Amino acid sequence: MAQSTAFLRIGTRGSPLALVQARAVRARLAAAMGVEEDGIELVVIRTTGDIIQDRTLAEEGGKGLFTKEIEEALLDGRVDLAVHSAKDMPTVLPGGLILAACLEREDPRDVFISRKARSLAELPKAASLGTASLRRQAIAMRARPDLRVTPLRGNVETRLRKLNAGEVDATLLALAGLRRLGLTEHATHVMSADEFLPAVAQGAIGIETRTDNKRVRDTLAGIDHANTSTAVACERSFLEALDGSCKTPIAGHATIAGDAVQFRGLIARPDGSAAHDIAGTGHRKDAIIIGREAGRELKHRAGPGFFD
């Protein structure tokens, strides 16, 4: 096999959204390095999450299904960095890897999409809601316990196609993904973060590399969006304190204004029958502590049997 002559090799999934995100990172890196974009290679890697389409992520082991094979390529040197939807990254990264940078966050809110109603509240009684996200399921059922939740897997385009084919009455998707794909015309209603708290790191593009690769880490520092990285660090520390995975309905969202961090978090039972939420605020330098303490407090408040 011919040796790559690329300045950098970026590992990415092959879905349309993943490629849009990887190309955005490549463009930023090329500008920062003063090289042509074609000097930075995109290496498409198929992940377990891409292969498994008939079961939910919770059934198959939760977070990491969309990153495992890419992280293996990082660790064995086949790629120099990896681009992920930050919300798909495992709570604890494999040893030797680091979340080195984030691009500026896109709108983190969820959108309601349906041809039968203008909002979640207006769906007919016992309507079918298609989602593979336990967070979306729990928050939706908290408001509408009559809904029938149907697992809906696949990339954004696949889920929209299934909705349009009448397989479900409605679905919920990330606004960020629709925007990046130029598909916002499909959004029926944008849910406010107050009514539908986003997933941890939703809307953020995370860039992962090896801890010992100083050259790449230094390069990534030049394209990092500090406020996004601070918010994501706060949210991920909340997730880690809860031992969170795709098996657990968890939501968390941090915002940065000047030196202040505001954080909101939520845990729920999958059927929405019980939930606990929390808010915290403090200085941005304490963002990780704010998230961690919020997670510990909710874990204590909910009790050891909450997720059983």
Describe the role of every protein-language-model region.
Residues 86-89, 176-178:
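Short glycine-rich anion-binding loops that position phosphate/pyrophosphate groups of nucleotides
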Residues 84-85, 113, 130-132, 172-174, ...:
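Short beta-strand segments
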Residues 62, 66-67, 71, 85, ...:
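Non-catalytic, solvent-exposed segments at the cell envelope interface
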Residues 54-80:
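Short, structured active-site "lid" loops
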Residues 72, 120-121, 160-161:
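Alpha-helical segments flanking ligand/cofactor-binding loops in enzyme cores
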